[in-house]
Each structure stands twice: as C-alpha cells, then as structure tokens.
C-alpha cells in the first residue's frame, strides 16, 4: 500500500468510526429540552418563519438580543430544508464535526516537524474522530459543535502567521509606508480575526483566542524595533473580529435602540433584575459542577434547599443558620429581588473579607480542576459519580463503568496533550496553543459563575493537536532527507 493510499484509508476509517459514534449519540441520547436548547430552537424558528429574531414576552412576539445570532442562523438554515427538526440539526452537527476532525488533523500536522506530518495527521484525525466529548455534543441543540469548528479553523488560519510556522509579515520600516496594510485582506491575522468574529456570533467569549494570540505576540515583539509588526497584527485581528459583528450591532441599534455588539452578560431582558449578590455568594464556595444544578440553575424558578449546600459553604453554624433563613425567604417567593440580593451580597462580602485567598485563588483553582476533570457525562443518562467507589459499584455498575470510562478517556487525552506540549516546546505554534488553553480556562474559572465542563471544549482542537504529537515517533533520516520527505 502506498503512503497516499494508507493516508486516505486512515482518513476514511477514522471518519466512518467518528460518524458511527456521533450518529449513535444523536439517535440514542438526543437532548432537546435541556438548558438553552428550546430557546435556540424557538429563536431560529421565529426568525425563519416570522422574520423576527425574538420570542414571546407576555404573549407578544418580541425582538431580543439575549443571544448572539450565529447558532440560531445555523439552525434556521437546517430548518429551512428539514422543518423544525432537532434531529436534523443534530445530524447536520455530526457532519460538521467530522469536518472539524480534518481541520484538527491539519492543525496537528502543521505543528509537527516536516518528516512526521503524515503520521501526526493520521493520529490527529483518529483522536479527533474518536473523542467522545466533542462527539457527544453533536447530540444536543447547543452552540458547542459550531463554535468548536470555527475555533479550529481560526487557530489553523492564525498558525499560518508568525504565531505558527508561518512567515514574517512585516518589516519595522513598513509602519510609516503605504505598505502597512498591503495584502491585508489575505493576511492570516485578518482572516483569522474574521473567523473569530463569526465565532463570536456563536459564543461571545470566542475573542479569547485573539487575546491569547496578542499575548504571545506581545512577549515575542516587546522590543521597539518590532512594534510595527505588533501594531499591524493587532489592527488586522481587531478589524477582522469587528467586521462580522457590525450587522448584528446595527440591527440592535435600529430595532432595539441599544448599542450591543454581543449579548447582555446575563441574557437578561431590558429592566430585568440580575441577582449578582447571589452570584457573589456562590463565588465564595461553589466549584463542583453538581452544585450548579442545585443552586445557580434554580434561581427564580425552584426552591433551593439548605441541605443541598455543602458544609464548606459555611464558616460556622451561625452562618449556616443565617443562610437557611435567607433561603427560606427566597423559597417563599422564588424570586431574588434587590433587597434579598443584598443579603446574599453581604454574606459574600463577609466570607471574602475573612478568607480572601479562598475566593480569589482557591475556588478558581478548584473550578479549573472541575472544568477539566469532571466526568463529561452531563448529556448521558449517567450520574457522573465515582465516590464512594464500593457503594457506586454495588448500586449501579453500568453507570459506574460509563463514568469511569469517560474519566479515564479524558485523562488519557490530557496526558497525551501534556506529553505533546513537551515534545513540541521548541516548535513554532506551541506557545499559542498553550496560552489559549490557559487563558480560556482562567477566564471561565474566575469570571463565570457556573463551572460547566463544556466551557473548555473549545480548547479541544488545540488539545487534540498537541495530543497527536507523541505519535510522530523518531526519524532515523538525516537532516537533509527530512527536509525532502
């Protein structure tokens, strides 16, 4: 078998296996009524059939800006062919995710040395195709599959620049010449920024990728002689990000009379109160994913039981009793108004003043671990529990085995990525992928109140590209032979 046929065979087999796994998830474990899924479906259908990007408020179809329009546009495109079918949307996501597998493999190959790119590409496509975590999200009507694709494409494009094994794009003297923007429309910085801009219309935090790129370039080009290159790259990426957002911002200005390039931080309607005091309180202790279900996702809709709150959320019995009284007050009305929210905020302030490192360091670090190492079974009929091992094994062995399998697979991907990062530490592009994973993780650990494991799935294109590097093997060829391979 020729190397080319071997490559094609591996691609075909990997994509076939990946398609089978994703289709199984979509047909066996579809999720249409969880989280924002019903909201996205309604937004897309109203936009497609009634020409209004909105949903009923007090019985009246009302234009809103609560979600950026990228994913509803994707759903509307699917619905225009298949009707209001969540299953059709999932199958479209299966196809899109298989394309993402190829993009990730290309990214992995670009990071590898020339002589190993074929092997690393094959490893990358298999690792991406068989990844159950990204694959499982094709079975839910949420943004993850689309934004992972756009993130992978953006990274691949940006790796064509100085961020990866690309070319130097500008001499310092060009800053004062007409050539400063020569070739801008085809420049990897501009094109990568454009892809990130479209990704921002799917998930508003996608520009974290541009911030990561900027940090890498800032460290590399901190000397005055390199400032021209730094300024040019920053301008091109910034303009690229903004251009796709302009139509959305214009729509919000003309329809809602509001300056909004993204979406409201807490997806609130105009005049709707956001209980930030409650969030301040949970930020002093909440780091486990299970506690999100029991607290944050119940606010203003369900009762919150003091018995569901872990003991480490209280510094004393008196504080626990105080919080019990506050929660009783909430449970009577199932609404957190400004007065009640102030009580949560006061408890949060007191807890932070007593233990500032807990709020600002310990909890974010624990959330980091939760983001990366919580069993990624949230879309499956599995409890996600491993402890106590003996009890879980005896009570529900299949559930335990599913959770254990997903935990081990997640650990294998992370360990392979760490090994790949070490092997690639002197190659162009290594630092960009690492910084992106770190920046995105720290952002969600510190500034987002719910440590959901899905928030780091956008790191998986970078993670899998790194995880493929150990499969490069070693070359016995001479340096000259490597260059011609």
What are these model-predicted stretches?
Residues 35-38, 66, 88-99, 123-158, ...:
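Multi-pass, polyprenyl lipid-linked donor-dependent membrane glycosyltransferases
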Residues 124-126, 188-203, 214, 240-244:
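Membrane-interface alpha helices of multi-pass inner-membrane proteins
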Residues 8, 87-91, 333-334, 344-346, ...:
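Membrane-interface anchor segments at the N-terminal boundary of transmembrane helices
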Residues 119-125, 157-197, 228-232:
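Short hydrophobic alpha-helices at membrane interfaces in multi-pass membrane enzymes
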Residues 23-24, 38-63, 70-73, 295:
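Extracytosolic helix-loop segments that constitute the early lumenal/periplasmic catalytic or substrate-binding loops
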Residues 91-115, 153, 157, 416-419:
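Transmembrane-helix motifs of polytopic, lipid-linked glycan transferases
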Residues 9-14, 104-130, 148-149, 181, ...:
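Transmembrane-helix signature of polytopic, membrane-embedded enzymes
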Residues 262-383:
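Membrane-proximal stem/loop segments at transmembrane-domain junctions that anchor or position
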């Amino acid at each position: 078998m020729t190397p080319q046929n071997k490559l094609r065979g591996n691609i075909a087999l990997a994509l076939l296996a990946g398609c089978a796994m994703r289709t199984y998830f979509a047909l066996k474990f579809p999720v249409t009524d969880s989280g924002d899924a019903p909201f996205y479906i309604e937004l897309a259908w109203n936009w497609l059939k009634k020409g209004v990007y909105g949903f009923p408020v007090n019985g009246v179809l009302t234009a809103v800006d609560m979600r950026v329009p990228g994913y509803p546009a994707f759903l509307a495109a699917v619905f225009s062919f298949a009707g209001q079918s969540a299953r059709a949307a999932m199958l479209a996501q299966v196809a899109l995710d298989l394309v993402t597998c190829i993009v990730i493999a290309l990214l992995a190959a670009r990071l590898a040395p020339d002589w190993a790119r074929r092997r690393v590409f094959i490893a990358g496509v298999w690792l991406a195709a068989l990844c159950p975590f990204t694959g499982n999200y094709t079975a839910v009507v949420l943004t993850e599959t689309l934004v992972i694709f756009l993130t992978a494409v953006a990274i691949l494009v940006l790796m064509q620049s100085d961020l990866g094994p690309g070319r130097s794009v500008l001499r310092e003297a060009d800053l004062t010449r007409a050539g400063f923007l020569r070739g801008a429309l085809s420049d990897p910085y501009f094109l990568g920024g454009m892809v990130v801009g479209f990704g921002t219309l799917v998930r508003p935090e996608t520009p974290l990728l541009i911030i990561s790129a900027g940090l890498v370039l800032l460290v590399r080009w901190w000397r005055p002689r390199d400032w021209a290159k730094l300024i040019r790259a920053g301008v091109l990426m910034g303009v690229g990000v903004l251009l796709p957002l302009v139509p959305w911002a214009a729509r919000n200005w003309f329809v809602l009379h509001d300056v909004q390039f993204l979406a409201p931080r807490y997806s609130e309607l105009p005049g709707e109160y956001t209980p930030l005091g409650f969030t301040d309180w949970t930020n002093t202790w909440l780091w486990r994913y299970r506690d999100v279900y029991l607290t944050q996702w119940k606010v203003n809709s369900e009762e919150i039981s003091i018995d569901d709150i872990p003991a480490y959320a209280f510094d004393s019995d008196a504080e626990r009793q105080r919080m019990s009284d506050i929660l009783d007050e909430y449970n009577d009305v199932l609404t957190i108004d400004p007065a009640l929210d102030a009580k949560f905020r006061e408890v949060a302030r007191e807890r932070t003043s007593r233990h500032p490192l807990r709020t600002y360091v310990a909890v974010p670090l624990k959330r980091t671990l939760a983001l990366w190492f919580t069993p990624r079974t949230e879309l499956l009929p599995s409890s996600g529990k491993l402890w106590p091992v003996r009890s879980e094994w005896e009570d529900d062995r299949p559930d335990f085995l599913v959770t254990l399998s997903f935990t081990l697979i997640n650990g294998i991907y992370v360990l392979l990525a760490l090994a790949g990062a070490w092997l690639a530490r002197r190659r162009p592009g290594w630092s960009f992928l690492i910084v992106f994973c770190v920046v995105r993780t720290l952002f969600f650990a510190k500034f987002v109140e719910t440590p959901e494991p899905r928030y780091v799935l956008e790191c998986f294109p970078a993670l899998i590209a790194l995880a493929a590097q150990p499969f490069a093997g070693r070359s016995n060829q001479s340096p000259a032979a490597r260059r011609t391979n």
